[in-house]
């Protein structure tokens, strides 16, 4: 299941926490972040560059036969991303729900605190009259 990940140097796929993908010039840059272990100050990560596939596409079919250079993601990177999605999506689904609830709770707490302060200010105005 993780053959492509092992091929790019991922020794322990179960420790993968998340990943990012960006394009720079003619390369796709994949950065894999590992779960932080006890005593680690920073997350460990692995950065891998994948050259983009270069292609020429026919852009004018009206007889001029004009071609344009284009690039696309490499097939081996697609396989790696598929494996990463399988590993990270299970954890992400569970964490996302918990994070959303915590975020909503913090927001509600701020709203209630602000409303309490507003009511207290209104009470102060009434008592100073």
UniProtKB/Swiss-Prot annotation:
Signal sequence annotation: none
Database matches in InterPro entries: UPF0325
Coiled coil regions in record: none
NCBIfam families named among the record's database cross-references: PRK13677.1 (NF010213)
Family according to the record: Belongs to the UPF0325 family.
The protein's name in its UniProt record: UPF0325 protein HCH_00487
């Amino acid at each position: 299941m993780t053959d492509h990940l092992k091929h790019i140097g991922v020794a322990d796929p179960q420790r993968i926490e998340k990943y990012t993908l960006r394009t720079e010039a003619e390369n796709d840059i994949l950065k894999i972040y590992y779960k932080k272990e006890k005593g680690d100050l920073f997350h460990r990560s692995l950065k891998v560059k994948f050259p983009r596939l270069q292609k020429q596409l026919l852009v004018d079919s009206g007889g001029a036969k004009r071609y344009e250079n284009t690039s696309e993601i490499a097939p081996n990177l697609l396989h790696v991303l598929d494996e990463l999605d399988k590993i990270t999506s299970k954890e992400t689904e569970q964490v996302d729900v918990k994070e959303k609830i915590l975020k909503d709770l913090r927001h509600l707490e701020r709203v209630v605190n602000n409303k309490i302060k507003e009511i207290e200010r209104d009470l102060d105005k009434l008592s100073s009259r």
